[in-house]
Amino acid sequence: MAKQLLFNEEARKSLLAGVEQISNAVKVTLGPKGRNVLIDKSFGAPTVTKDGVSVAREVELENKFENMGAQLLKEVATKTNDVAGDGTTTATVLAYSMVKEGLKAVAAGMTPLELKRGIDKAVAIAVEDIQKNSKEIKGSEEVAHVASVSANNDAEIGKIIADAIAKVGKDGVIDVGEAQTMETVTDYVEGMQFDRGYISSYFVTDRDRMETVFENPYILIYDKSISTMKDLLPLLEQVAQSGRPLLIIAEDVEGEALATLVVNSLRGALKTCAVKAPGFGDRRKEMLEDIAVLTGGQVVSEELGFKLEAAQISMLGQAKSIKIDKDNTMIIDGAGKSKDIKDRVTQIKAQLDATDSEYDSEKLRERLAKLSGGVAVIKIGAVTEVEMKEKKHRVEDALSATRAAIEEGIVAGGGLAMIQAIAALEKADMSSLTEDEKVGFKIVKRALEEPIRQIAENAGLDGAVIAEKAKEKKGVGFDAAKMEWTDMVKAGIIDPAKVTRSALQNAASIASLLLTTECAITDIPEKQAGPAMPSPDMGGMGMY
């Protein structure tokens, strides 16, 4: 397909036009008085959101060159969301300011590469200042403040998230789902849960709830399929003598073995239940080992030199109770030693630090949570589906922001941390910089004012005036919700340092790319074919 090209100033102007459009759509959502954006869908009701990345993802411009600029800015929001889970609107606003001021400098004859170097050096100093000023998050109250600020000053959401984290711990899994009622509730799962249910409904002990519940069971953990009874019989006889129930976790239980277990369960001779092992491939082996550590048992595996027919009762795991339905198995209060569990958690954390894969990271975090904290499910309730989706977006943002705050600490919110970083740039030694690099510093200084300007403008005030006052008032920021100057940290208006840092770094990265662009190439749009001419012998068709 033929291509069209734009060069120099013309290319950069087209890219800027695209960046500006996406920035204008996103920036209206910033701050406590930010507005919603309504997004049309090809089916169903439109989506209402205040989430910057959700808005950015929907933007697709008709002009191909402008669309390239828009897609680059979309990358800022997406990357910030991936790294920190929040701060996407701030990142977008910062990037637009850097691109706009940077392109003015390029048009005035500055060297793009030197501007880029200046921007990179300034951002490094600002990031260092943000990290230096960050404070470790302490107590549920500060967790609630971070969450409520991210959820558009919704104190109820802040409290729900703070309570969930207090219950499952900072490594615990917190899932966000949809409730069937108008009320938002949190369900807690103590112990380990995995998504495999009973193989046969004949194992059910509670017919009303269709659940299998065992108290003080033994747990056999086996990494292969069981199809014949002779391999399992020696172990079953040992368990039967103890009078305790048995849960079998294996790759599969089928044929003669399954039939015999079902018959024994129905007769009451031996309470048993069989479930398939969670996960697949190597991940399955790791998860079986996790279950073994949690329950104080041993994975019966020929790879480790253990055969099923030679398995002893001492190899079995134990728990206070287990609950199994058709989809899930929950092991409550496993008998594993706390030292072994702690060592296993440390091992998984090391794997988490070493992996680059987002998918692997997610699965490792899930395993970590199952071992160390348990699971909380926040079920979002609302009057309408549109409201529920909007609220769910805010809860997910708040949850991500809270995790980021626990990880890297908190800084003053409302754009104040960035205003304070300007002071660090003004104190920096610029004697070794070229004139163009100094302009790069000025571009970053101007961009750091932009979040507080936009928050003020969304509250109906003059952003430039508020930004100047914030620079004069040391350590005091503007609370746009109450329209007053206050100590932001004491007032609970705080942002995660990771969110602020990531927003600035990602904005600078994309801005630098745009400033150093000299040519843009895209496909020539295909011309739309006109409507077909009617056939001359069909003139009377459709006439009455």
Curated annotation (Swiss-Prot):
GO cellular component terms, A-Z: cytoplasm
Keyword Cytoplasm: yes
Listed EC numbers: 5.6.1.7
PROSITE patterns referenced in this protein's UniProt entry, alphabetically: CHAPERONINS_CPN60 (PS00296)
GO biological process, one term: protein refolding
Pfam families reported for this sequence: Cpn60_TCP1 (PF00118)
Alphabetized InterPro entries for the sequence: Chaperonin_Cpn60_CS, Cpn60/GroEL, Cpn60/GroEL/TCP-1, GroEL-like_apical_dom_sf, GROEL-like_equatorial_sf, TCP-1-like_intermed_sf
Swiss-Prot/TrEMBL keywords: ATP-binding, Chaperone, Cytoplasm, Isomerase, Nucleotide-binding
Catalytic activity annotation: ATP + H2O + a folded polypeptide = ADP + phosphate + an unfolded polypeptide
Zinc-finger keyword on record: no
Domain of life: Bacteria
Annotated GO MF terms: ATP binding; ATP-dependent protein folding chaperone; isomerase activity; unfolded protein binding
CDD domains reported for this sequence: GroEL
Quaternary organization: Forms a cylinder of 14 subunits composed of two heptameric rings stacked back-to-back. Interacts with the co-chaperonin GroES.
Protein family per UniProt: Belongs to the chaperonin (HSP60) family.
Known function: Together with its co-chaperonin GroES, plays an essential role in assisting protein folding. The GroEL-GroES system forms a nano-cage that allows encapsulation of the non-native substrate proteins and provides a physical environment optimized to promote and accelerate protein folding.
Name listed for the protein in its UniProt record: Chaperonin GroEL
Organism: Treponema denticola (strain ATCC 35405 / DSM 14222 / CIP 103919 / JCM 8153 / KCTC 15104)
Organism phylogeny: Bacteria, Pseudomonadati, Spirochaetota, Spirochaetia, Spirochaetales
Gene name of the encoded protein: groEL
